[in-house]
């Protein structure tokens, strides 16, 4: 009996000691480290495409080029009924796309779009060689077409006592520039001869234009510069409208070229309207 009581007392003492230890040291043992302040986390960066009309225009240009490119559409015909021409250019009339695809397989032909704005759209059956030749033709036409851009100006200076041979050489150079759609600024300096006529410099400008009737005219009439020691004028190519007017009046090209111009850039007034 005494042994049982002693055992209970011992267990009670151990429990009391454990409780006191947990009470005194529990906050140091069980308590985790104090949270440290974390640096601010940057927000997630999302790449956003900048707004630009240029990108849209580029995409539209590429799409337009793809639409206008001369190539076979294959079997992807969006319209049910189309207007068809054969490889010889003969009109086959309106056909269902299924019949067109069957005709392509029978004759080993390709289908290209000719006029998408027509109703129904117009297509043509061509051989591979015909498509290749048409592409070459379109490429050559594109190269030959004038490139849009600012008009460049060439400059040429010479003396009024220049020899006839040298003057002819310079006139040919001016003509080559005009044919390439350049403007040409001509400056004629007064010669050293004392008995030289006052209007000789202006007359030389008129003579140059006279040799180029039908291709060039004055953009700026001859005007004295440098205190009358030189004369300057500007020549430009004829516009398409002026070329047509010149061809319609072939008997007066020289007179028109000599009498034209009002002294202002971009206005000639040389051809009959």
UniProtKB/Swiss-Prot annotation:
Pfam families: IF3_C (PF00707), IF3_N (PF05198). InterPro entries: T_IF-3_C_sf, T_IF-3_N_sf, Translation_initiation_fac_3, Translation_initiation_fac_3_C, Translation_initiation_fac_3_N. Residues 1-32 form a transit peptide. Residues 242-273 are annotated as: Disordered. Residues 252-265 have a biased composition (Basic and acidic residues). It comes from the Eukaryota. GO terms for biological process: mitochondrial translational initiation; ribosome disassembly. Keywords: Initiation factor, Mitochondrion, Protein biosynthesis, Transit peptide. It is found in: Mitochondrion. GO terms for molecular function: ribosomal small subunit binding; ribosome binding; translation factor activity, RNA binding; translation initiation factor activity. Its main location: mitochondrion. Residues 33-92 form a propeptide. IF-3 binds to the 28S ribosomal subunit and shifts the equilibrium between 55S ribosomes and their 39S and 28S subunits in favor of the free subunits, thus enhancing the availability of 28S subunits on which protein synthesis initiation begins. GO terms for cellular component: mitochondrial matrix; mitochondrion. The lineage of its organism: Eukaryota, Metazoa, Chordata, Craniata, Vertebrata. Belongs to the IF-3 family. It comes from Bos taurus. This is Translation initiation factor IF-3, mitochondrial.
